[in-house]
Regions:
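Hydrophobic alpha-helical bundle cores within soluble ligand-binding/oligomerization subdomains
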Residues: 1-164
């Protein structure tokens, strides 16, 4: 994380790579991993409408769980526990969790009377930047907001799960 901070770049993707593979990526590996994450930031057709918007939940964890369970029905290899397939599923979930979280939040706030806006993720953005872009009505965010969120994502990834 210190290297990313010093160099003014985002560190979450590098940390995710480290946690999946047990070592830091070199520049080419990181770029390839970032491209994989961008590639998998796509939900099945009508998923947002049929799964997320039709039954909004005040509990984002409930919304995430329901979405992940439904995504399994779109995965022809969901029961394949080979290492390459499980790795693909991990990368795909890392890519999709931000979208599922933001879209779940947007669905709930819409149900509560706010305007609804659903933006598509942008492949050139980091995970932190995409979260902020998806979350805001005008997709705007500042450099510092994105970096603070990236640090938060990195710390949560490095320090375990649970409700922390």
């Amino acid at each position: 994380m210190e290297g990313a901070l010093k160099e003014g770049r985002f560190g979450f993707e590098e940390t995710a790579y480290l946690l999946l593979l047990g070592r830091l990526p070199n520049a080419a590996e990181l770029e390839s991993f970032q491209k994989q994450l961008a590639y998998y930031r796509t939900l099945p057709n009508n998923f947002v409408r049929d799964i997320i918007l039709k039954a909004p939940s005040h509990d984002i964890m409930n919304s995430l769980a329901r979405s992940v369970l439904n995504l399994a029905s779109y995965d022809d290899q969901c029961d394949d526990i080979s290492l390459p397939n499980v790795m693909r599923q991990c990368v795909q979930l890392i890519s999709l969790f931000p979208m599922l979280s933001v879209y779940g939040y947007q669905a709930y706030t819409y149900k509560s009377g706010s305007s609804l806006y659903i933006h598509a993720p942008r492949p050139e953005l980091s995970t932190a930047e995409n979260i902020l872009s998806l979350l805001r009505p005008d997709s705007s965010y500042s450099f510092w907001e994105a970096h603070v969120l990236d640090i938060c994502l990195t710390l949560h990834a490095e320090h375990g799960g649970g409700n922390n």
